[in-house]
Amino acid sequence: MKIKAIFIVILIIIYCFTSCVNGNAGGITAPSLGGVPMRLTPEEDKIAVFSQGSPDGFWARNDRGNGPPFNCSFGRSNAVIANDVLTLSLTKGGEKGFIGAEYRSSGHFSFGYYSVSMKAAKCPGVISSFFTYTGWPWDEIDIEFLGDDTTKVQFNYYTNGVGGHEYVHYLGFDASEDFHEYGFDWQPDSITWYVDGKAVYQARQNIPSHPGQIMMNIWNVADTNANWAGKFDESGLPVHAQYQWIGYHSAEEGAIDK
């Protein structure tokens, strides 16, 4: 009995350590999501297909950028649609020394399934992403690639400005080498993230409720955030993230406010 009790304690410690390392803030991981069906984006749900040129209702940002942890401005010329893809680039230049890119929808979208086919940027200290963002009161749902290790992806969300829900999923492939489909199903009581149609993580606590813009960007972190995304290595510039299409399937009537 004593040996059995010790074994159980060891298992509990291992579970807690693994949850901490992965940033599992009360979510449900892939082994427990086996009953969730596959979900790949059909053609009719693709609201922006870059092989067809510049889509209506989307635009590229052109300004000084954000404060920390961002360490670049955003340039419209660094968001280019050509050769069937949208390419977002991080380059040297501008008043901050570096110019990133951000591409976003004009309209706000509510509950539903959001998806993207993308190839991540690979460079220490560089973030490439697909996410929704409201502005005030700051609801956000993230798919983020940390450029120091693109064999994993980070999921996160904010509700009324409260975050701390980071979860790192190990992909089993390098996201910078080829296009893959990533998505999340946002419902009033849950967010379920998908990779190539397979559900891999689900959150159920303090779920966002405000409609947000669909956004993608590439940017470099400040040195104070090196422990998160790796120390930025500017010798790797220019670096690029590429996108083939964006998908959205509404979960409710009137879900798009253009």
Locate each region found by the language model.
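GH16 jelly-roll
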Residues: G23-K258
